[in-house]
């Protein structure tokens, strides 16, 4: 494999995981903050809020997993290598 392609693949894999984690990380922090605020306002709605929060965490985390899949594809099944 061309060393330039290998180096670019490693850099792109690192960037794909790093950038894919920024948005969901910020979203999870915001969602958790609002969930705590909502539970503090209405303690009787804790179960519903927690369920919605965990479901939204799963959707947000799937975006990070997509970035990881792209990184693994670049590292181990590189489409640019001959």
From Swiss-Prot:
The gene is atpH. In plastids the F-type ATPase is also known as CF(1)CF(0). It is found in: Plastid, Chloroplast thylakoid membrane. It comes from the Eukaryota. Coiled coil: none annotated. The record marks 61 as: Reversibly protonated during proton transport. PANTHER family: ATP SYNTHASE LIPID-BINDING PROTEIN, MITOCHONDRIAL, ATPASE PROTEIN 9. The lineage of its organism: Eukaryota, Viridiplantae, Chlorophyta, Ulvophyceae, Oltmannsiellopsidales. This is ATP synthase subunit c, chloroplastic. It comes from Oltmannsiellopsis viridis (Marine flagellate).
């Amino acid at each position: 494999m061309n060393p330039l392609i290998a180096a670019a693949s490693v850099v792109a894999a690192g960037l794909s995981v790093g950038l894919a984690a920024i948005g969901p990380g910020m979203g999870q922090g915001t969602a958790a903050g609002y969930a705590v605020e909502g539970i503090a306002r209405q303690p009787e709605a804790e179960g519903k809020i927690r369920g919605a929060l965990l479901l939204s965490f799963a959707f947000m985390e799937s975006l990070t997993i997509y970035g990881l899949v792209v990184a693994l594809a670049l590292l181990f099944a590189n489409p640019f290598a001959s």
